[in-house]
A protein has these predicted regions:
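Non-transmembrane, aqueous-exposed alpha-helical and coiled segments at domain scale
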Residues: 2-199, 204-305
Length: 305
């Protein structure tokens, strides 16, 4: 610990980059504890041999990823970071540059598929870093000297159903439900189910879309803080499961791992809804740093980088 305390800024930067590179690569190889547990629960609930075989293939894939030290899905996604950083965290000014360097290193050590294509030029950068990518979402925490960072790998399949729109106010919450069902029944089968469905409700599309993605960061089993919101989550989850999309879209007892709603106060004349989905290989991971750049992995119990 004393050595960490006495590190100069460049040593802190290099330590942070190294940890985040390893953690980003790790995210592509191991599902978070809650997702792994939920898949086991869903497998038990299946009544058909085909559905059980699909789940068994998923677990075999996870086993091989561990044994071979390789990503669990060939599509390692576009890297996104959701950063909650204290105003007194020593590297607050360096985080963006450090994360870009971490992605370059993670691409090599993962290895991660090259998924950053520059718009208009249609050129793959070859290192998963490009204009505004990795995407970094910021939350500033006053009077804190710690940082908490979520890593999210946004694959092509699970990003496909993503959408947002502003509803007419008279459509109300039933309009929200219809919007979600129309999108999942149209595109959910192609997004590698069972899905985690994130819904954002707000007054404008950009806020609703952002909240829908943040809803995917919540641990499975958590509920919206408002009882009415929690009830709507349960209603939508039950309805989507009744469609029986099943694992891999091949039919089964469940379509989703869960439904999470996040909301912001809205304008009286508008109700905007955003939708994001996570596939069965929901690669979402969380890590916390103290001011000495020592880390704790939150999402994967006992993980050591």
């Amino acid at each position: 610990m004393e050595g960490a305390i006495n590190m100069d800024r460049e040593e802190q930067r290099q330590k942070f980059i190294d940890i985040m590179a390893k953690f980003t690569a790790y995210t592509g190889k191991y599902l978070p504890d809650d997702v792994h547990a939920r898949l086991k629960e869903l497998r038990v609930q299946e009544n058909t041999a085909l559905a059980r075989v699909v789940y068994d293939a998923m677990f075999e894939d996870l086993k091989l990823a561990d044994e071979l030290d390789r990503p669990l899905c060939q599509d390692t996604g576009v890297i996104q970071y959701f950063v909650q950083v204290g105003t007194r965290f020593p590297l607050i000014d360096d985080i963006e540059e450090c994360l870009r360097e971490a992605v370059k290193k993670a691409t090599i050590i993962g290895p991660l598929r090259h998924n950053a294509v520059e718009v208009f030029d249609e050129k793959n950068t070859g290192n998963n870093v490009g204009k505004r990518i990795p995407w970094i979402d910021w939350e500033i925490v006053p009077n804190s000297d710690e940082a908490k960072i979520y890593v999210y790998m946004a694959g092509g399949g699970c990003s496909l159903p993503g959408t947002a729109r502003v509803l007419m106010p008279l459509e109300g919450y039933e309009g929200v439900v219809k919007f979600v069902f129309d999108q999942i029944t149209s595109y959910g089968i192609n997004a590698c189910p069972p899905l985690l469905v994130g819904i954002g409700i707000a007054g404008s599309v950009e806020v609703a879309a952002k909240l829908s993605k943040k809803a995917l960061l919540r641990p499975l089993g958590t509920k919206n803080s408002n009882p009415r919101g929690a009830e709507l989550e349960e209603r939508i989850e039950a309805g989507l499961n009744a469609i029986k999309i099943g694992p891999g879209g091949l039919g089964g007892e469940n379509s989703v791992m869960g439904v999470h709603i996040e909301e912001a106060a809205r304008h009286p004349a508008t109700i905007a809804v955003g939708l994001s989905t996570g596939c069965w290989a929901h690669r979402r991971a969380a890590i916390r740093f103290n001011p000495h750049i020592d880390y704790e992995v939150i999402s994967h119990k006992g993980a050591v980088l």
